[in-house]
Amino acid sequence: NRSTPESPLGNLSADGLIWAAKHFHNVDADVAVYNSGGVRANIAKGDVTLGDVYAAFPFDNALSILTITGKNLKRLMYKVPFDLYVNKEVKLVSNSSGWVSSITVNGQQIDDNKTYTVATIDYISDNDAYTDILGNPIDREDSVEMIRDYLGEYFKYLADQNNGNITGAVDGRVIIQ
């Protein structure tokens, strides 16, 4: 459901960006954000095919790894209740109007003066709606590979680790009070 701040597949997608940054680019990203409009279909219970992954993630988006300030990361996190999925290390509390009262990454408040590594998609890195928020990243690396290919590999990895099972969940990353 693209109108909610969390979905099982949206959460898996954001976690998959963290995994892809680490496994394919040797980068330990602090945060991942995936736009909710980029997830276009659900994946039904049962065997997951490449066609299922392509239907869910039909756009030719690349992985974009950004280094940004904590101040700009906070600004990006304010968009989460409206249209972004985040990785499990992020906890965000907002009211129904979108006012964010709490954001933590790995249990810590975001430090305006610290730098953070963000795994996202080039759609977010290049989209005017986000570039004004992100400012000029301190560093940026874009992949040649498409996100859907990374996510397909992530789903295989999860299946291998969990006796063939992949389970997405809504787990309280984003709480609307």
Range-by-range predicted roles:
Residues 7, 11-177:
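Feature captures C-terminal
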